[in-house]
Amino acid sequence: MRTWVLLLAAGSGTRLATAGLPDAKQFLPLHGAPLYWASARTMAHVAGIEGIVFVFPPHRVEEERARISALDDGSVLGLDWHVVGGGAARQDSVACGLAALPRSCEAVLVHDAARPFASPALVARVLSALHDGHAGVVPGIPLTDTVKETTDGFVANTPDRSRLVAVQTPQGFTLKALSTAHETARTAGWNVTDDAALLERCGIPVRIVAGEVVNAKITTPEDLAMLDANEPQVTVPCVGWGYDVHRYGEGRPMKLGGVLIPEGPEVVAHSDGDVLLHALADALLGCIGAGDIGLHFPDSDAAFDNANSAMLLDRVLHMTHEARLRLTHVDLTIVAQVPKLSPWRDKIRANVARLLDLPVTSVNFKATTEEGLGFTGEKRGIKAIAAVTGLRPMP
């Protein structure tokens, strides 16, 4: 299902303006970029997403288009993207985003830019439920507080908390269902606070999937503490080194850096055998002192049989994010007599940069041989070496 994201960043930030902030919340800085960029990077880590439509206040469209072009230098996102102006209300902004989607789009994720901490796993959960055939999907978390309905300042009713969830974004929809719901809302004059409510009113079932407590929305001045908590103040450099080997033989088609190498020999492996991503994952784990991939994804576990190495790398990246590692550079080397990799060098480099959310200029890829010596020279296998550098918060 061809899926795009509507990243809503068109709000005026009225509640935060009362705190004297000079800009709306979606433009506040986080990790050296505007808040909305964190969500864009998250979406880029999820397989199956083809592009993003950024929806900004109309007067910010050109400014933010230029800013995204600078941030995406070297195709950091690895996705198509467009920038459009929003409307006076949230529904209007979603409608503006829908109008900018390509004709090939079949499904859409609607996400609030003020939720910068949604994880790739959460996005993938929503996307998976869409692929299962649901027309609408929303993440939700159980309520921990008792909720009261009030009238004129007095308690009127206490709903059963066990039947309530607090919903979040991204919310996923088939394009047909969401477009129909918005058209019906315009005709009927409905005004709701999220897109799932439009489907409800149209009688279209909406599936709930597990949300994340950390996926909080930056709304009030008190919420700004979450941004401060995600900005390490003092960092120290760190280095990680990774090494992996696979032998040739009947097994898996060769993949390097997530790129299929059709002329390469098959490799014997428990997972999909991407020796380059395995070495890279080990190097990343080394940077944060978290062991190696054999510890986290043992070959004795059937769950990882033919596992997608890009998925394993994404799990490792989640660990590095939790450790607040800021990756700065990656240097990768393949040692193999065959196949010849020069035709694939740029594609491998670009894909690794996309997976790591780094500029291509921060990823180096080399291929060499051992001049006919050893098992690689005898065309019996392949080696990969990875070195990564980064910055971590000072202990």
UniProtKB/Swiss-Prot annotation:
Return the InterPro entries for the record.
IspD (IPR001228), IspD/F (IPR026596), IspD/TarI (IPR034683), ISPD_synthase_CS (IPR018294), MECDP_synthase (IPR003526), MECDP_synthase_CS (IPR020555), MECDP_synthase_sf (IPR036571), Nucleotide-diphossugar_trans (IPR029044)
Task: Name its pathway.
Answer: Isoprenoid biosynthesis; isopentenyl diphosphate biosynthesis via DXP pathway; isopentenyl diphosphate from 1-deoxy-D-xylulose 5-phosphate: step 2/6; Isoprenoid biosynthesis; isopentenyl diphosphate biosynthesis via DXP pathway; isopentenyl diphosphate from 1-deoxy-D-xylulose 5-phosphate: step 4/6
- Signal sequence, start to end: none
Q: What is this protein called?
A: Bifunctional enzyme IspD/IspF
Any one GO molecular-function label of the UniProt entry: 2-C-methyl-D-erythritol 4-phosphate cytidylyltransferase activity
- HAMAP family in alphabetical order: IspD, IspDF, IspF
Which SUPFAM superfamilies does the record associate with it? IpsF-like, Nucleotide-diphospho-sugar transferases
